[in-house]
């Protein structure tokens, strides 16, 4: 007689026949919709049969008992009930196996026994990293099994359409945001514990920039940016100047309070210090010179403080620094020029005792015709300083304010100038712009959520047939649309208290409490990204976009993306956009899945990574000008973000003119966002910076940091921070400048 049952975890419990009966009755009810006397009788008979099946006082496992239940049901005339029981049993087995697998993954993350460097900005060995990554795996599992539609889940699992940041899906977070610093610094803001007064000096303003970046980064999973920091900081440079001027005047007069109110007009004036006709400044030249000197000193210290804060204040799990970006370069007022100069000199100076290259913020110099690109332009000297910074620190990157894709911007409103959120994400024309506002305003808008279509998978499904591929791609783009709307609706369903800082302070444009958070989120973008165009072309025609035939097909593919996004934008009144995905981790994981299914295919899967979006493969021997020529034919199809970069060797640090030629060439070719990769190796013992391999040429140390660009951002030592695929990609990057500049 059966007396004990051994559970799956090894525990033994008393045999309970009622549990067998209940399981059998559930199977009958699932088929018949009710429990009949026949069902009750069969459940009783099978339970008695199992109890008496064993001799003496026996112990049976769960699996053995379930096998006997199946045998008993199959012996009846109700084979349909037997099938229902078997199906349910198999489903439960699959769920247990999934739970076992997720438990295994969580244990690996908690112990850091299988570090994969999915995010180069997260230290997976740290306490916070281990805890955060374990939590992320659980969140991803719940998103896939409980929240995503079956179609979206299948596309993700089958390496067709990747849903980004699954760990943030369930809680309904959005991706990234361009923060409206003009408003937050001038009006102050509230936090959960207190409220913050408006900035009263340039030092305070830069401190608050770091604070706001930190606070906003906790409301989302992506990057945060300032769209025109040079313009934003002008009033606070002036506030500091007025303070220092009055301090100087107090050394001359007993009381300066009578003149202070008369100077306040200058703070919000459109006329800068050099042109103001304020009589107090002209009549007190020594005080003026003192105030200007002290203001510049305060400004430099404030910028230095911001750089250090943004590289040390780790506010996310995993000891993660917020992904911060600052756009600047177009303000021609003296005060704005001082800000630009301080930002660039701070970048060149570096951070810490070894003056290391700042990882954050990502600096983005906004190139603008008539402002900073040519000799004689008012900010041309600052463009030269930006190039020097790029040669030494890789930052800044370069945004093209005159890009054709940003048509309609207001030359008098820097909020409408083209800017990016660092890696490449950008805000295009807002179809939901409020009446009377410019649809190109970037502040308070961001990318809500992205997906990425794995193009090589679709090419394999088409068996190399171009027409069939285009049909499959068209359906995949429609699927991507549906997945984005599905996630957008879920994000819009969240309580504003979930991101109280963002909604209470209006950091996201257009929030109206009576209409819910959709009123703000509708101004952001829904990005349809892509991965592996070069490999896709190889599958379809045996050539990539560096050939005329490859470029012709590439344009056809990108036109389909653009046309569909434009169509969806009008139909759904949501800002769908074509996105050239960074694919920091996806370039490797998508390739790994591809290889598992299709094996090694020459020029397609014979490496550990897919080529990002529409880029020329990194291993192609090509000049920087040719690379720009090729990619410039495709970047115009993207409205939600793209980047073009070239790879140069360390010798360019002594050839600023060559960098200027390249940047201007890219801008003239209508490249929206351009970056230059230059090796940046630092000895962490003596501080020497240059290009070297395993040992410092000065002190011989092997304590080396080899800094490389991972997407649009920089990160730490690529040999430890990047995943396997991205490491290989970095090592295969050819120098485009050899003999070409």
Give the label of every model feature segment.
Residues 79-92, 670-672, 677-679, 720-741:
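Long, highly charged low-complexity segments enriched in Glu/Asp and Lys/Arg with interspersed Ser/Thr
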Residues 528-537:
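Extended amphipathic alpha-helical segments enriched in small hydrophobics
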Residues 91-95, 102-522, 539, 543, ...:
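Conserved catalytic cores of very large enzyme subunits
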Residues 7-12, 30-37, 55, 433, ...:
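A ubiquitous short alpha-helical element
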Residues 1-109, 728, 732-733:
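Charged, amphipathic alpha-helical regulatory modules used
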Residues 46-52, 73, 553-567, 729-740:
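Short, mixed-charge aromatic SLiMs
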């Amino acid at each position: 007689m059966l007396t004990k049952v051994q559970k799956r975890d090894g525990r033994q419990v008393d045999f309970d026949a009622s549990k067998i009966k209940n399981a059998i009755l559930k199977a009958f009810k699932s088929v018949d919709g009710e429990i009949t006397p026949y069902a009750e009788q069969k459940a009783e008979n099978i339970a008695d049969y199992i109890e008496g099946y064993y001799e003496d006082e026996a112990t049976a496992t769960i699996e053995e008992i379930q096998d006997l239940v199946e045998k008993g049901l199959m012996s009846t005339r109700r084979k349909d009930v037997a099938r229902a029981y078997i199906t349910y049993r198999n489903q439960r087995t699959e769920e247990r196996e999934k739970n076992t697998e997720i438990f295994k993954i969580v244990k690996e993350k908690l112990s850091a026994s299988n570090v994969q460097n999915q995010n180069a900005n997260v230290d997976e060995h740290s306490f916070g990293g281990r805890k955060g990554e374990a939590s992320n795996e659980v969140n991803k599992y719940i998103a896939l099994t409980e929240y995503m539609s079956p179609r979206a889940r299948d596309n993700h699992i089958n390496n067709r359409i990747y849903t980004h940041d699954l760990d943030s899906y369930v809680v309904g977070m959005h991706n990234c945001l361009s923060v409206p610093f003009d408003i937050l610094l001038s009006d102050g803001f509230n936090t959960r514990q207190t409220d913050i007064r408006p900035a009263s000096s340039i030092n305070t303003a830069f401190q608050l920039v770091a604070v706001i970046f930190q606070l906003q980064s906790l409301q989302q999973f992506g990057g945060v940016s300032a769209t025109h920091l040079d313009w934003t900081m002008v009033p606070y440079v002036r506030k500091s100047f007025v303070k220092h001027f009055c301090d100087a005047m107090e050394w001359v007069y007993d009381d300066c309070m009578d003149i202070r109110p008369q100077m306040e007009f200058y703070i919000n004036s459109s006329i800068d210090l050099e042109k103001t006709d304020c009589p107090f400044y002209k009549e007190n030249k020594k005080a003026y010179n003192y105030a200007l000197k002290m203001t510049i000193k305060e400004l430099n210290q404030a910028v230095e403080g911001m750089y250090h804060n943004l590289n040390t204040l780790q506010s996310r799990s995993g000891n993660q620094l917020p992904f911060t970006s600052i756009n600047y370069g177009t303000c021609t007022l003296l005060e704005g020029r001082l800000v630009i100069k301080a930002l660039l000199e701070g970048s060149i100076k570096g951070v810490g005792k070894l003056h290391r290259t700042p990882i954050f913020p990502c600096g983005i110099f906004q190139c603008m015709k008539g402002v900073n690109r040519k000799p004689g332009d008012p900010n041309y000297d600052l463009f030269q300083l930006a190039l020097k910074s790029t040669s030494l620190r890789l930052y800044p990157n370069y945004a093209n304010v005159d890009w054709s894709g940003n048509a309609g911007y207001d030359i008098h409103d820097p909020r409408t100038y083209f800017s990016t959120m660092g890696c490449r994400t950008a805000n295009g024309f807002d179809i939901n712009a409020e009446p009377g506002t410019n649809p190109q305003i970037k502040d308070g808008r961001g990318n809500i959520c992205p997906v990425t279509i794995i193009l090589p998978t679709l090419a394999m499904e088409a068996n190399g047939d171009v027409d069939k591929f285009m049909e499959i791609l068209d359906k995949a783009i429609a699927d991507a649309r549906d997945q984005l709307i599905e996630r957008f609706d879920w994000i819009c369903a969240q309580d504003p208290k979930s991101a109280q800082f963002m909604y209470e302070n209006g950091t996201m444009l257009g929030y109206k409490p009576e209409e819910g958070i959709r009123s703000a989120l509708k101004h952001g973008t829904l990005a349809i990204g892509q991965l592996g165009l070069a490999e896709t072309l190889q599958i379809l025609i045996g050539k990539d976009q560096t050939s005329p035939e490859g470029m012709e097909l590439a344009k056809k593919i990108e036109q389909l993306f653009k046309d569909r996004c434009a169509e969806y934008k009008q139909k759904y009144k949501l800002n769908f956009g074509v996105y050239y995905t960074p694919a920091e981790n996806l370039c490797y994981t998508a390739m790994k899945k591809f290889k598992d299914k299709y094996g090694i295919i020459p020029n397609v899967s014979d490496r550990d990574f897919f080529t990002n979006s529409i880029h020329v493969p990194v291993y192609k021997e090509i000049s920087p000008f040719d690379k720009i020529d090729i990619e410039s034919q495709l970047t115009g199809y993207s409205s939600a973000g793209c980047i073009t970069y070239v790879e140069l060797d360390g010798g360019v640090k002594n050839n600023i003119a060559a960098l200027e030629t390249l940047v201007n060439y890219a801008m003239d070719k209508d490249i929206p966002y351009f970056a230059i990769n230059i090796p940046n190796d630092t000895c962490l013992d003596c501080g020497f910076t240059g290009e070297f391999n395993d040992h410092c040429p000065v002190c011989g140390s092997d304590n080396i940091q080899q800094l490389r660009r991972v997407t649009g951002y920089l990160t730490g030592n690529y040999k430890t921070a990047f995943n396997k695929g991205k490491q290989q990609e970095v090592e295969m990057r050819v120098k485009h400048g050899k003999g070409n500049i």
